[in-house]
């Protein structure tokens, strides 16, 4: 429980950066930790639930316990705002979000909810990358838009997501519906053409990943299911027509575990990447027993949710390392979070992922972090691993004057691969995996030669972390990446040489010009969402601007929910059936909150 509450401290500040309780900030939260860890996490106090048990509670249950329950007297000097923040993090969403997110409260229910007869009868954007290669490239036929159409795009409808502040879940388009979710844990099925709402579903916690849809077997009347994960490590299958839960599986018990990358389906399996917030909690603490989380990929039976295999990026389980001067037990190895959606290569029975940094130093350096890894889709066996940045051991808050014994002696640069590898075939018949790293370097690895480096290209003059975060898109000739320093770059797939660069200036005073959200491509054009709330389109030929839209401007929502746009920093736009969709609102770092889904078409 002690280390769990320190995770809580960090994540409260991450998720609620503008909350009024920040006047008290760390002092009150650390005081809470000091009062509670003498019981929670103490084996001698058997009646006090540990961190894993607390993580299973709803935010309403946590809030009730600390306001009117058995421990409320111990927290009598903690403000109600802080209690709600604490309950919201432990529960993974806002208190009472379920009461607010119900589609029945909206003013625009769809007049009919027809059965889904086929997923191939209408254009779709399924999951994170639109197809198994994660190229984020929509074909001309499926897009229904040309580069010439882009300047004529107009807002068709806007939809507000109640109780949401971050538009985490990238819109999925299938069967004439839009499936989307947010930090509230609310999931919605919306009519693609009109924005009317079919149904809502309330997850246990916030949903940060794109939704995947596929046929499901052996589940009675349910013929198609939507799949997604939450920030408590749960994975769900929900009836795509009715919104009723079919199954739920917890793929990781670690209190800091979350599903960030979108699960991806193939045949009867669902492949789920697992990430963590542990690296953001441990570095600034002198009492956290760092560190025990290991990134993983789990293969589930898509029909039942049963786990088939699970592969950890770091194969060795954490063991006690040493104790600090104050007696805190430290652990390791740890790290290797998977922030991205797996790329599938069924012809070679391979799954490809980008891996995150290590959290702990080890006698023998970890070889599987900060790189690209191939895993057998059938068995979970690691086929090969190519590490691009060795010895990257990083925890948030380390460096400078920080003397926490959790911090590595040699703090690493934090050069995770946050984005999915893109599988492309070259004219000469060779295949490459194109992967953008946080240091602004794009790598091409050969999947057929144990991940050997084909080429690498540095996109910026000064290497710092966070240059490329959630990745690019690729057509047959080039890959396109947005940069957090401002700008879009085209890189030739054949040799890694830069084709063009277009700088971007912020459209909003006081807002950054960063382009951290994933890029989306159609033939002749790419789309990029910016920290300033501007959605932009560029020509793939030379990078000249084609169109832009300020998502922070005031709009009227079709469902009657008050909503506003904000920053765009992770999920990218999606395109299908002549329409463009994007969520606006992203708060990590210096981003602005938002709860708005926007749909555009040529009118």
Name each region found by the language model:
Residues 18-32, 103-107, 111-112:
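Electrostatic cytochrome c docking/interface patches
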Residues 26-33, 37-74:
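Gly/Gly-Pro-rich "capping" loops immediately C-terminal to redox-active cysteine motifs
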Residues 147-162, 187-207, 213-222, 228-257, ...:
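Extracytoplasmic/lumenal domain signature
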Residues 46-48, 132-139, 163-169, 188, ...:
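Short, solvent-exposed loop/turn elements at domain surfaces
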Residues 104-155, 313, 317-318:
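Blade/loop signatures of beta-propeller domains
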Residues 5-18:
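Bacterial N-terminal signal peptides
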């Amino acid at each position: 429980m002690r280390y769990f509450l320190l995770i809580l401290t960090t994540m409260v500040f991450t998720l609620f950066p503008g909350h009024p309780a920040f006047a008290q900030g760390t002092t009150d939260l650390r005081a809470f930790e000091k009062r509670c860890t003498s019981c929670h996490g103490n084996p001698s106090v058997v009646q006090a639930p540990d961190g894993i048990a607390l993580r299973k509670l709803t935010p309403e249950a946590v809030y009730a316990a600390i306001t009117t329950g058995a421990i409320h007297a111990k927290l009598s000097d903690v403000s109600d705002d802080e209690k709600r923040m604490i309950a919201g993090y432990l529960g993974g969403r806002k208190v009472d979000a379920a009461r607010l997110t119900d589609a029945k409260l909206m003013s625009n229910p769809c007049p009919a909810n027809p059965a889904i007869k086929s997923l191939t009868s209408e254009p779709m954007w399924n999951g994170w990358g639109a197809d198994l290669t994660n190229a984020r490239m929509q074909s001309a036929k499926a897009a229904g838009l040309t580069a010439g159409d882009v300047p004529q795009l107009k807002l068709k409808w806007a939809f507000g997501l109640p109780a949401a502040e971050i538009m985490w879940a990238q819109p999925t388009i299938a069967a004439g519906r839009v499936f989307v979710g947010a930090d509230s844990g609310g999931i919605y099925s919306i009519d693609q053409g009109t924005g009317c709402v079919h149904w809502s579903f309330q997850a246990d916690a916030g949903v940060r990943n794109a939704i995947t849809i596929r046929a499901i077997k052996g589940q009675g009347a349910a013929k198609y299911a939507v799949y997604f994960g939450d920030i408590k490590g749960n994975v769900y299958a929900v009836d795509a027509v009715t919104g009723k839960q079919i199954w739920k599986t917890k793929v990781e018990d670690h209190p800091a575990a979350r599903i960030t990358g979108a699960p991806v389906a193939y045949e009867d399996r669902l492949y789920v990447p697992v990430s963590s917030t542990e690296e953001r909690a441990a570095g600034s603490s002198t009492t956290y027993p760092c560190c025990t989380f290991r990134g993983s990929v789990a293969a589930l039976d898509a029909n039942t949710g049963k786990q088939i295999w699970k592969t950890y990026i770091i194969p060795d389980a954490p063991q006690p390392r040493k104790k600090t001067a104050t007696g805190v037990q430290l652990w390791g190895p740890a790290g290797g979070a998977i922030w991205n959606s797996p790329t599938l290569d069924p012809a070679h029975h391979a799954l490809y992922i980008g891996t995150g940094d290590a959290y702990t130093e080890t006698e023998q350096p970890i070889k599987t972090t900060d790189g690209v890894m191939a895993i057998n889709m059938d068995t979970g066996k690691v086929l090969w691993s190519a590490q691009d940045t060795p010895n990257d051991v990083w925890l948030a808050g380390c460096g400078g004057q920080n003397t926490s014994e959790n911090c590595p002696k040699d703090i690493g640069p934090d050069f995770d691969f946050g984005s999915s590898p893109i599988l492309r075939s070259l004219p000469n018949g060779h295949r490459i995996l194109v992967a953008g790293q946080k240091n602004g370097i794009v790598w091409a690895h050969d999947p057929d030669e144990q991940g050997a480096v084909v080429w690498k290209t540095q996109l910026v003059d000064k290497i710092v972390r966070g240059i490329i975060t959630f990745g690019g898109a690729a057509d047959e000739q080039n890959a396109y990446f947005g940069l957090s320093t401002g700008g879009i770059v085209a890189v030739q797939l054949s040799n890694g040489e830069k084709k063009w660069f277009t700088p971007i200036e912020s459209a909003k005073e006081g807002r950054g010009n960063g382009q951290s959200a994933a890029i989306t491509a159609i033939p002749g054009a790419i789309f990029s969402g910016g920290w300033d709330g501007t959605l932009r389109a560029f020509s793939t030929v030379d990078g000249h601007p084609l169109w832009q839209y300020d998502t922070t401007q005031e709009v009227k929502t079709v469902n009657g929910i008050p909503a506003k746009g904000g920053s765009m920093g992770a999920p990218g736009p999606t395109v299908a059936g002549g329409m463009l969709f994007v969520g606006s609102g992203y708060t990590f770092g210096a981003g602005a909150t938002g709860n708005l889904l926007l749909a555009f078409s040529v009118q």
